[in-house]
Regions:
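Bacterial carbohydrate/catabolite-sensing allosteric modules
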Residues: 1-154
Length: 154
């Protein structure tokens, strides 16, 4: 979907890939709605049907990753041996999947506190409120859905 969050995440993704010398083919980037397991499953099918499918799929959230896992397993593929996957959000359910989902966990407590502070500023001082973008650091939860470059799970 086309939202500020999606645009910012995608821009950051492309910048990071470029920094490491990784080129991302346009056909590897597919948009789905957040928490849409069905849409993510359909996008996964399209990616797997490409002449040169990706070796890793990064999903916009953990629920989308669950939709992808379903499609990958239906095709008889193994995660991460045949394809690596990673999610985003760090929901508890990600730690219950087999194998455990590799995911980027957001510090939602810090994010909520920061948002509340900004909202209070906006209410109390509407004339001085400024729009800004804040980057909140995440923490990688290393599940077992991404194959390391040496061939081991990580």
């Amino acid at each position: 979907t086309d939202s500020a969050v999606t645009t910012n995440r995608l821009s950051s993704f492309y910048r990071t890939a470029e920094k490491f010398g990784v080129e991302i083919p346009d056909e590897y980037v597919m948009m789905t709605r957040y928490r849409d397991t069905k849409g993510a499953g359909e996008a996964t099918e399209k990616l797997l049907d490409l002449r040169r499918p990706p070796t890793c799929i990064l999903y916009p959230d953990d629920f989308a990753a669950l939709g992808g896992i379903h499609v990958i397993r239906e095709r008889g593929m193994s995660i991460p041996e045949d394809i690596s996957i990673a999610g985003y959000d760090g929901i508890r359910l990600a730690k219950l999947t087999v194998p455990n989902l590799t995911t980027l966990c957001q510090d939602t407590q810090h994010l909520g506190q920061y948002a509340a502070e900004k909202l209070i500023d906006l209410i109390e001082k509407p004339k001085t409120a400024m729009r800004n973008i804040t980057i909140v650091q995440g923490k990688l939860y290393e599940g077992q859905t991404v194959l390391k470059l040496d061939g081991s799970r990580g």
